UniProtKB/Swiss-Prot annotation:
Site (Increases basicity of active site His): D298
SUPFAM superfamilies documented for this protein: Enolase C-terminal domain-like, Enolase N-terminal domain-like
Residue sites binding Mg(2+) per the record: D222, E248, E276
Species this chain originates from: Salmonella newport (strain SL254)
Name of this protein: L-rhamnonate dehydratase
Gene behind the chain: rhmD
Record site: Transition state stabilizer: E345
Function of the protein: Catalyzes the dehydration of L-rhamnonate to 2-keto-3-deoxy-L-rhamnonate (KDR).
EC number from the UniProt entry: 4.2.1.90
Active site (UniProt): H325 (proton acceptor)
Origin organism lineage: Bacteria, Pseudomonadati, Pseudomonadota, Gammaproteobacteria, Enterobacterales
Length: 401
């Protein structure tokens, strides 16, 4: 089989600072009013009264969704979405295009390495540039799968299990249990600036959910980089009587010594997890060395599927789990091939967590959601990532080349 070359790469965006809030899509923080994801969740900005109540108040949704499409000489296309918006469009159209167009559709690792090397001087260890590279990488995998007529998970070597089981992230673990999920992860609402009173309030929330969900349903806390080691340690011990399964991302990404200390201090049997806001393989190697139990890369932010596969191998070599942050189909096709990912995350994007809504709604068509907390591998059997771009969304292409 002669594989075609890539003829075009294009980048669009939706949402972000120039749009009405609530666009959704790849920037899942960009939701409308009265949504749990924007309701007094503890953040690094919570210590400032003006930015305590709402994450959108400090601009969590200003980037918007980046959509990258790659087109082969034969007219077939692949695409992906991430969080990078208009600035990501500029990087794709004005810089990364030179490493993509003219390459064979199978040259994914070559393109990936060239994108990383060429942006190293302005990318740092993650953030906007890495989100953009991730989006390109995912689009390339989607195109390759569609050209050869295979789902991405089969390109990676095939499934190691028949289905993926999920826990749900949202404000209502009790509703998640009714929907068949294996656990529920709640955001914390208080931080170090709230003192011991904040610890008591979040521990009371866990206690209330434990009573509602029973003794065996998993309960976890997502702290979203909002704490310090002392506060996180005290919170973990306050929640231990309620069988908290893990405490997640308590500290900013680069506080590796803090994660090492927190793991030493955590109650016996309670896991410490992080990784959502780490980018690059090197940062995950350092994170793994802290001894945390689960690494949680976001495939749309860490360097794409190419990097996620490397992170999973790194974690496996150390006996650690890798459970990616959300990411819908882009994670599904990876984790069903990983032996060290026994479960995965589903992010509840309905406002009150009472219904199942696709994570990247409305930008993806045919995006699957779990049934009774699970997705069978047969659901993933369409070529590429198995979804299509919703071109009825108001796509903007601000740059070209």
């Amino acid at each position: 089989m002669t594989l075609p070359k890539i003829k075009h790469v294009r980048a669009w965006f939706i949402g972000g600072a120039t749009a009405e809030k609530g666009a959704g899509g790849g920037d899942y923080h960009d939701q409308g009013g009265n949504h749990w994801i924007d309701d007094h969740i503890a953040t690094p900005m919570s210590k400032y009264r003006d930015y305590e109540q709402s994450r959108q108040s400090f601009g969590i949704n200003v980037l918007g969704t980046l959509i990258v499409e790659v087109e082969a000489e034969n007219g077939q296309t692949g695409f992906a979405v991430s969080t990078a918006g208009e600035m990501g469009c500029f990087i794709v159209e004005k810089h990364l295009n030179r490493f993509i167009e003219g390459k064979c559709v199978s040259d994914i690792k070559l393109i990936h390495d060239q994108m990383l090397g060429a942006t190293m001087y302005y990318s740092g260890s993650g953030g906007l540039v890495m989100n953009t590279i991730s989006c390109v990488d995912l689009a390339l995998w989607d195109l390759f799968g569609k050209v050869v007529g295979l789902p991405v998970y089969k390109l990676l070597g095939g499934a190691v299990r028949d289905e993926i089981q999920f826990y749900a992230t949202g404000a209502r673990p009790d509703l998640a249990k009714e929907m068949g999920f294996i656990g529920g992860k709640m955001p914390t609402h208080w931080g170090p600036h709230d003192g011991d009173a904040g610890i008591r309030k979040d521990a009371a929330m866990v206690a209330d959910m434990r009573e509602k969900c029973g003794p065996d349903f998993w309960l976890m806390l997502d702290c979203w980089m909002s704490q310090d080691v002392n506060y996180a340690t005290k919170l973990a011990h306050a929640c231990a009587p309620f069988n908290l399964k893990w405490i997640e991302e308590c500290l900013p990404p680069q506080q590796y010594e803090g994660y090492r200390e927190l793991k030493r201090n955590a109650p016996a049997g309670m896991m410490v997890t992080s990784g959502e806001h780490h980018g690059t393989l090197q940062s995950f190697r350092t994170l793994a060395e802290t001894g945390i139990d689960i690494m949680q890369p976001d495939v749309g932010w860490c360097g794409g599927l190419t990097t996620l596969v490397e992170i999973a191998a790194l974690a496996k070599s150390r006996g650690q789990l890798v459970v990616p942050h959300g990411s819908s189909v882009y994670s599904h096709h990876a984790v069903i091939t990983f032996t060290n990912t026994p479960f995965s995350e589903f992010l509840m994007t309905s406002p009150d967590c009472s219904t199942l809504r696709p994570q990247f709604d409305p930008i993806l068509l045919d995006e699957p959601v779990p049934v009774n907390g699970r997705i069978h591998k047969s659901v993933l059997d369409k070529p590429g990532f198995g979804v299509e771009l919703n071109r009825d969304c108001h796509l903007k292409r601000p740059y070209s080349h």
